[in-house]
Amino acid sequence: MRSLAFLICSATLFAADYDVLIRHARVIDGAGNPWMRADVAIKDARIVAVGRIPAAATATRVIDARERVLAPGFIDVHTHVEDDIEKNPRAGNFLLDGVTTVITGNCGSSELNLSAWFDKLAKVGLGINVGSLVGHNTVRREVMGAADRQATPAEIARMQALVDRAMRDGAMGFSTGLEYVPGIYSNTDEVIALAKSAAAHGGV
């Protein structure tokens, strides 16, 4: 029992300071500052230190990033990954370009039921962060099909309800694609009304 207690204590005493320690990187912080030479320490999946970290510091994994750039993950704000992200959830194509967050639902086309879609994505093990806009063409098609006419007040109200639901389900804003069917048949008043529904939730 004493031997077991000693082993447990020893493991605690000699545990690494960090999970990952990146040394000598050219750090660009994304705030517009000039790059700086620095070390970056990560523990429990969080950055816990940036700067000159003592040489005696230990880590489970040490990376020498000399002459390499270390920056926050890039955000690709214009993607159409609705189908692809389910087939390729690790998204290595984005990660190899330094992209760690994508925004989809652009050009007026998105998933209609974002709550169900987000739940599905949560189960597949995503390699990147995914956010979505709610698409004008999507909600118009749900209410009016491909009708080549202006929406009635009642139809606009139904579309507003869909936008409102999407925003409550986690949409980041509202997108349009007015050169595509059926959005091409809408007028300015319709677009403004739906944009206001998104804006009421702080959406873009």
What name fits each language-model region?
Residues 65-70, 74-75, 79, 86-176, ...:
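Divalent-metal coordination cores built from histidine and acidic residues
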Residues 1-7:
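Sec-dependent signal peptide recognition
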Residues 192:
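Glycine-rich ThDP/TPP pyrophosphate-binding loop and its adjacent helix/strand module
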Residues 7-15:
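Hydrophobic h-region of N-terminal signal peptides that target proteins for export
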Residues 110-111, 176-188:
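Glycine-rich, proline-tolerant flexible connector loops at the mouths of alpha/beta enzymes
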